[in-house]
Amino acid sequence: DYMRPVLGYSENGTFDIDNVAPGLAFMMGVYEDAVEYADENDVVADPEIISEWKSVERSGRTKADNRFETIGPLCTTKWSQSWPYNKFCPVASWDSDEHVPVGCVATAMAQIMRYWAHPIQGTGTESYTPWCFDCYGFSYPQQTANFGETVYDWDNMPDKIYDNSPVEQIDAVATLSYHCGVAVKMKYEHHDGDGSTARGEHIPEAVTTYFSYAQCEFLDMFQSYDEWMDKLKESIIRRIPVYYQGCYASGCHAFVCDGMDPNELFHFNYGWGGKNDGFFAPDAIQYSHYGVGA
């Protein structure tokens, strides 16, 4: 009984265990890892978890904090990485979309920026040649984004875009998604299908340099659990979506934390077209020895 009675839920959609969003796959891996650690190290249940189990046994419901109601999800967007979101990403003849994926880091950035609808216009330019590991002689051409000459058309960025969406909407969302990738020097996938990746630690500099956001910081979870939870709760209570990332055996994934319910389950938008978005525990046993960042 050292594990929380409820680890997650969604208020809509269906769940297919064989086809989950990479972000949720990461969370499930973290839960599994934490439980394995607890079994091997005789971890004793946290008093709060004991209280939750008693509440379930007594009333069939978990013990909620009645000081606040559910907040969020703050981000109404359900964006993804494939076509048409990747319209302006590098061409890839081996990909069914004929373009590489946007990348989870850029998709998370873009959804948070859409929430703030800022800036109207960017600042400066960035050019780089994407690094490509073990690409067998293949190389991507130089990627360039002229942020300073781009007006971001927030009014034409709906919650989702489709193949048949107006071209103005597709171009507005795809431009922002691509620019976020260039801003963090995205490493785009090659034919091996590893996906497009970037370091979340580059986001604070990118958003201040190219998008005129205030100074922000990238934090890791190698601090006390209580401090980590307090920072998350403070951000959500202030209606500030949080960029969230973590690494596990399945790889590194980035997504958005943008809500919280009275049971302190947090809403995660996994950047997979709305698939598997829901309220989840950032922990399974009130013990954290794995790393995530925000």
Residue ranges of predicted features:
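Stable alpha-helical elements in mature extracytoplasmic
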Residues: 100, 105-112, 199, 203-207, ...
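Low-complexity, Gly/Ser/Thr/Pro-rich intrinsically disordered linker/tail segments
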Residues: 286-294
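Active-site-adjacent substructure of cysteine-protease-like catalytic cores
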Residues: 205, 209-269
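Catalytic Cys-His active-site segments of thiol-dependent hydrolases/isopeptidases
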Residues: 1-14, 262-282
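Segments that shape or occlude catalytic/ligand-binding pockets
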Residues: 1-2, 12-18, 223-224, 230, ...
